[in-house]
Design a protein with these regions (language model features):
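S-adenosyl-L-methionine-dependent methyltransferase catalytic core, i.e., the SAM/SAH-binding region
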Residues: 1-186
């Protein structure tokens, strides 16, 4: 299934690319944006980051059909500065961040992001990491869960949600996406 990037024309226009631009795509995903960037920078270089090895393999194949002036790094963009220097670049011309969970990750129930279908709670962007959403909801303290919801969401009902999680896990471990969704809704 072909992936169509969101707001492609606006993104390309606002990056103000030149043929020799050095560009970072901090969140490669299915290479939707990067494919179009690579077509614009024939004498430049694209450096793309992603944590999701499944997507990286497909994206390299896609980008290779356009050119070879790119490098894909299986890493979180938090390591961008060091990784870009390792490639020999001191500065870049543009950086794209397309943040969030991809539709491919949501559609793949084995990833544990989709709360419309029964699946094991996983929610890891990088499957090499050990910590899953199941681990977090079942072992983190009330304070830790509240902190996560405060820092990473705009959830105004975080206290009742956390209290529901704590109450539920007294009886049984939370294992699936549907269980968690029902706990949150209750």
């Amino acid at each position: 299934m072909r992936h169509y990037p969101v707001m492609l024309n606006e993104v390309i226009e606002n990056l103000s690319l030149k043929e020799n631009s050095i560009v970072i795509d901090a969140t490669l995903g299915a290479a939707g944006h990067s494919s179009f960037i690579l077509k614009q920078i024939k004498k430049g270089f694209l450096i793309a980051f992603d944590q999701d090895k499944d997507e990286i393999d497909k994206s390299i194949e896609t980008l290779s059909q356009i050119g070879n002036n790119f490098s894909v790094i299986n890493s979180n963009f938090a390591e961008m500065k060091d990784k870009v220097k390792e490639l020999g670049y001191e500065k870049v011309d543009a950086i794209l961040f397309d943040l969030g969970t991809s539709s491919m990750q949501m559609d793949d129930i084995t990833r544990g992001f989709n709360y419309h279908e029964e699946a094991i709670l996983d929610m890891r962007m990088d499957r090499r990491t050990k910590l899953t959403a199941k681990d977090i909801v079942n072992t983190y303290s009330k304070e830790e869960l509240l902190r996560i919801l405060k820092e990473y969401s705009d959830e105004k009902f975080r206290l009742p949600i956390v209290n529901n999680i704590l109450k539920y896990r007294e009886k049984k471990e939370i294992e699936t996406t549907i269980e968690l969704a029902e706990i949150i809704k209750s």
